[in-house]
């Protein structure tokens, strides 16, 4: 009987798959958006200036997702709430960040959503915004940006006026596309 029980226990473990978990940090130096742009976001061959961050300090930090299914091993994380809510070891619950940050480009993106989902509403404001801006000059003729966008609210507010949006805006001479 013991051998049979042990056999079935070992067989059941063979179907168990271990997954790594994302690590979130916004302690120094990850609490400094300028440092993170220069040392985490951008690789070599880029000169940066005019760093600015708008939002609450709990909305930005660093993540390590090595050995997860996220698709990016590590980088900068920005969130509409507290970034620590993304950590699976934190008790779930949304902690919204109430700030007065707004951006006309993000509002335009938000207003493009209704037509894409077959709706006719108008978005009049954006909330819980985090904006990281900087100027950069690359030493080469191309630039690559990898990102993952996620929404905790997607299934709750699908096809409504409450949509999470993301924008990556480039401007300057010679920008095409």
Regions found by a protein language model. Give the residues of each.
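Aromatic (Trp/Tyr/Phe) and Gly/Pro-enriched flexible surface segments
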Residues: 21-177
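Bacterial Sec-dependent N-terminal signal peptides
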Residues: 1-24
């Amino acid at each position: 009987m013991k051998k049979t029980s042990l056999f079935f226990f070992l067989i059941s473990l063979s179907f168990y798959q271990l997954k790594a978990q994302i690590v979130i940090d916004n302690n120094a130096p990850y609490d400094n958006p300028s440092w993170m742009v220069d040392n985490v976001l951008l690789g070599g061959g880029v000169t940066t200036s005019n760093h600015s961050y708008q939002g609450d300090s709990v909305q930005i930090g660093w993540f390590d997702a090595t050995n997860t299914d996220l698709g990016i091993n590590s980088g900068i994380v920005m969130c509409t709430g507290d970034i620590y809510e993304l950590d699976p070891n934190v008790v779930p619950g949304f902690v919204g960040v109430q700030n007065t940050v707004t951006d006309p480009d993000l509002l335009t993106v938000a207003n493009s959503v209704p037509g894409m989902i077959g709706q006719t509403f108008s978005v009049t404001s954006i909330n819980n915004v985090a904006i990281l801006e900087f100027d950069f000059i690359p030493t080469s003729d191309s630039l690559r940006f990898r990102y993952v966008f996620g929404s905790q609210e997607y299934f709750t507010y699908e096809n409504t006026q409450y949509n999470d949006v993301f924008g990556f805006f480039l401007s300057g001479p010679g920008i095409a596309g």
